A protein has these predicted regions:
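Patatin-like phospholipase
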Residues: 1-29, 37-275
Length: 275
């Protein structure tokens, strides 16, 4: 996840495509899932094109969308999840169908506060699952799937490597969008957001507990990395790079760093998966 910081992950994935590295299981959360589908559909450069072409387009994101009573989201929902993938920068549904593995997106059940892991398929042409995994509190309305409201998967499971192991993976590559040593903290704005969700107490709890869970997850990840069970790829620094970054030079630099790291580690990853 990490909104536009995920352009780092896009660089890594494009490098892996170049080196023909494709795992048989992919799980993503928030933007990690929304951009990850283009990895499974083998469309290098697609995510970068979308961000560069539309990051400063009001139809894509902006306060006007949030204030629109028919949209109620910082992103233009129809534009981002229908017009772009189905018309402007087409998503290759046929190629995704050829993907030999399984692709999951993490969503958070608004009523229980628990993570749910939804399998993405091309039957979901409205991209409901991708909307739900990206649905940040306040910036998105609740996204309903089968009459159940959902929000961003990062609220309940920010780094879903444990689910990968539970589902039978024995070797996992984790791509993070924060630098080594990063620790998440509970800010005053997060506490205010939690109060705003008083009608959904389990979401309020998720918001308050998220930083602690995230940091605990990182600690466990470090141990697994030392044990050789995971490979972790992350940027050197995200300082000065906003979640909703619009500076195209910064975006390109972050993508290039991800691509370079992906190329550098591709041999190790290929060997890791071949064990």
């Amino acid at each position: 996840g990490g909104a536009f910081r995920t352009i780092f992950s896009c660089g890594v994935m494009d490098a892996f495509l170049e080196k023909n590295i494709m795992p048989d299981y992919i799980i993503g959360v928030s933007a990690g899932a929304a951009y990850g589908v283009s990895y499974a559909s083998r469309q290098p450069g697609r995510n970068l094109k979308i961000i560069l072409d539309y990051c400063d387009d009001k139809r894509y994101m902006g306060i006007n969308n949030l204030l629109n009573p028919k949209n109620k989201c910082y992103y233009g929902l129809d534009f981002a999840y229908d017009t772009i993938p189905n018309k402007l920068v087409p998503f290759d549904y046929d190629e995704f169908d050829k993907y030999h593995g399984e692709f999951y997106a993490v969503v958070t059940n608004v009523l229980t506060g628990e993570p749910e892991y939804m399998k993405y398929t091309t039957a979901d042409r409205n991209n409901l699952i991708l909307k739900a995994t990206c649905a940040l509190p306040i910036l998105f309305p609740n996204i309903y799937i089968n009459d159940t409201p959902y929000l961003d998967g990062g609220l309940s499971d920010s780094i879903p490597y444990e689910k990968a192991f539970e589902d039978g993976c024995d070797r996992v590559v984790v791509v993070l969008t924060r630098e080594p040593g990063y620790k998440k903290s509970t800010t005053s704005s997060t506490k205010a957001m939690a109060r705003a969700y008083h009608r959904y107490p389990n979401i309020a709890i998720d918001l308050v507990k998220r930083a602690g869970r995230y940091n605990h997850s990182l600690k466990k990840l470090r141990r697994l990395e030392k044990e050789g069970k995971v490979i972790v790829i992350r940027p050197d620094s995200t300082e000065g790079f906003s979640r909703l970054e619009r500076d195209k030079e910064k975006i390109l630099n972050m993508y290039d760093e991800g691509y370079a790291k992906g190329i550098d580690i591709s041999g190790k990853v290929a060997e890791f998966f071949a064990k």
